[in-house]
């Protein structure tokens, strides 16, 4: 299987404390800064993947906008890798409108070559947002404004919403009415990871989400590796990421590199290979590429080798917290 989509986490830190991701006190055993990939190491890893054919790169976290060299990394990716045709960012949007030398971060990112921004937003209600993120309700508008700013720049914008029973499952129709086709929506099934207190009773499966959005029309996809099931709802495009109820492992072409340089071939798998240690041990780019290919050849068929969704949940403690993997 060819893996043309690389997701690189730039940091384990986050400025939110979302209930489905981590405890209120956050993840307390974050990796020391000197053990995270440096700017140059991030760029080198991406260059090796790009030369092997990766054409799509997404930068994640933690919260990637907390990393001061973010814009420089984006510019280097586009400068050094003409084969990278899509450069994306997944963010909570809290810092996109912050300014440095009078320039908004979102504008600097667009100028550096970022063409796709996914913004995490789990509620249109400020109080629900506050409860789910454990942050003040006053910050809710900041995220909404950031989404609109991304759309106004002509970026490919998606809103990612994790649907959680008892919190936001009644908002799906409101989300579909909030934006036109310039902002795509993706509703995500809650997934189990170490430290996120996963409770299967609070999972809202794809089939149930569908009942909350009447008049959906299926939208054919020309991307065989797309993990999202796409539909139209009026003027909106609505997608579902169904990792727990209907896996898409057979067509997954994604590979992840964590902020500490660990290569993970599956989001749910506990297996990893340290590219950081190889880099700091003096390997050549060719040797690094061979190490990556060897790891990819051992990728499990589905669910990181845990059999099914129930197995993923049972073995979540073996995996990292989400902020230490990368969204």
Task: Describe every region a protein language model picked out.
Residues 25-29, 126, 191-194, 273:
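A short, flexible beta-alpha/helix-coil linker loop
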Residues 39-59, 67-178, 182-186:
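Radical SAM/AdoMet-radical enzyme domain recognition
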């Amino acid at each position: 299987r060819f893996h043309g989509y690389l997701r690189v986490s730039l940091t384990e830190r986050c400025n939110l404390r979302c209930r489905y991701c981590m405890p209120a006190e956050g993840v307390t055993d974050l990796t020391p800064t000197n053990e995270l990939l440096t700017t140059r190491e991030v760029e080198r890893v991406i260059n090796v993947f790009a030369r092997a054919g990766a054409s799509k790169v997404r930068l994640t976290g933690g919260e990637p906008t907390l990393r001061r060299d973010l814009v420089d990394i984006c510019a280097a990716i586009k400068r050094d890798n003409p084969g990278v045709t899509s450069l994306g960012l997944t963010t909570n949007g809290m810092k996109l409108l912050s300014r440095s030398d009078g320039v908004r971060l979102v504008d600097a990112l667009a100028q550096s070559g970022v063409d796709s921004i996914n913004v995490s937003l789990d509620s249109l209600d400020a109080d629900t947002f506050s409860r789910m993120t454990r942050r003040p309700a006053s910050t809710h508008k900041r995220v909404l404004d950031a989404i609109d700013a991304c759309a106004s720049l002509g970026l490919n914008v998606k809103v990612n919403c994790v649907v959680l029973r008892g919190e936001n499952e009644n908002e799906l129709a409101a989300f579909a009415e909030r934006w036109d086709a310039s902002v795509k929506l993706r509703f995500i099934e809650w997934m189990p990871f170490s430290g996120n207190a996963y409770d299967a009773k609070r999972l809202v499966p794809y089939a149930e989400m569908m009942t909350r959005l009447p008049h959906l029309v299926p939208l054919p996809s020309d991307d065989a590796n797309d993990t999202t099931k796409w539909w139209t709802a009026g003027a909106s495009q609505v997608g579902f990421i169904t990792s727990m109820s209907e896996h898409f492992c057979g067509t997954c072409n994604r590979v992840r590199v964590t902020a500490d340089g660990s290569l993970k071939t599956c989001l749910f798998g506990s297996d990893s290979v340290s590219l950081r240690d190889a880099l700091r041990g003096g390997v050549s780019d060719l040797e690094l590429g061979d190490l990556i290919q060897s790891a990819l050849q051992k990728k499990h068929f589905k669910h990181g080798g845990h059999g099914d969704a129930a197995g993923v949940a049972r073995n979540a403690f073996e995996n990292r917290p989400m902020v230490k993997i990368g969204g």
